[in-house]
């Protein structure tokens, strides 16, 4: 199974790339984690945020391979413990589809992305910076994966 993290925004700080790669490289070939970055619209003093969000949504949806299960990351989604995430990942594997996890930009995800999602996941009720979310998601997925294979990474 491949988990494709589709995230709005490019040119992330070096620590974001290093943090994400630290966990992505730990996955085995049968459970790959891949990052696809979507160009964020240019924001300025007089930017039309609705238009920018719509364009980001179109680019995000166009990047999703046909047949992938779409999971959005948003504050109104379902909060999972590590054990629950491991269970969800097990269900994803049984579904025999690849996963596209969508992360929005500074204003979140376009409504069209949320409408198309089959599942909604909330990392926290807190507002998190979208670059940090990449690292948290990669680590959370890796931690949950290690539970499914009885690897000692996760401690209770």
From Swiss-Prot:
First-listed, main subcellular location of the protein, grouped into a coarse class: cytoplasm
Cell location: Cytoplasm
Domain of life: Bacteria
SUPFAM superfamilies according to UniProt: alpha/beta knot
Membrane-spanning residues: none
Positions of S-adenosyl-L-methionine binding: 73, 104, 123-128
Keywords (A to Z) from UniProt: Cytoplasm, Methyltransferase, rRNA processing, S-adenosyl-L-methionine, Transferase
Signal sequence extent: none
E.C. no: 2.1.1.177
UniProt-listed InterPro entries: Alpha/beta_knot_MTases (IPR029028), RlmH-like (IPR003742), tRNA_m1G_MTases_N (IPR029026)
Catalytic activity, reaction form: pseudouridine(1915) in 23S rRNA + S-adenosyl-L-methionine = N(3)-methylpseudouridine(1915) in 23S rRNA + S-adenosyl-L-homocysteine + H(+)
Pfam families per record: SPOUT_MTase (PF02590)
GO molecular function, one term: rRNA (pseudouridine-N3-)-methyltransferase activity
Subunit description: Homodimer.
Stated role: Specifically methylates the pseudouridine at position 1915 (m3Psi1915) in 23S rRNA.
Family designation: Belongs to the RNA methyltransferase RlmH family.
Protein name as it appears in the record: Ribosomal RNA large subunit methyltransferase H
């Amino acid at each position: 199974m491949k988990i494709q993290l589709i995230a709005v925004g490019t040119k992330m700080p070096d620590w974001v790339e290093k943090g994400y790669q630290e966990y992505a490289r730990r996955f085995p070939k049968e459970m790959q984690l891949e990052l696809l970055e979507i160009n964020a619209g240019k924001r300025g003093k007089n930017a039309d945020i609705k238009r920018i969000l719509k364009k980001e949504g179109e680019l995000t949806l166009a990047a999703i391979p046909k047949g992938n299960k779409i999971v959005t990351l948003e504050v109104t989604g379902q909060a999972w413990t590590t054990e629950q995430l491991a269970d969800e990942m097990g269900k994803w594997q049984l579904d025999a589809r690849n996963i596209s996890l969508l992360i929005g930009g500074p204003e979140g995800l376009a409504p069209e992305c949320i409408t198309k999602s089959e599942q909604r996941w909330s990392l926290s009720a807190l507002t998190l910076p979208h670059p940090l979310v990449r690292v948290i998601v990669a680590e959370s997925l890796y931690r949950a994966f290690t539970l499914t294979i009885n690897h000692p990474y996760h401690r209770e």
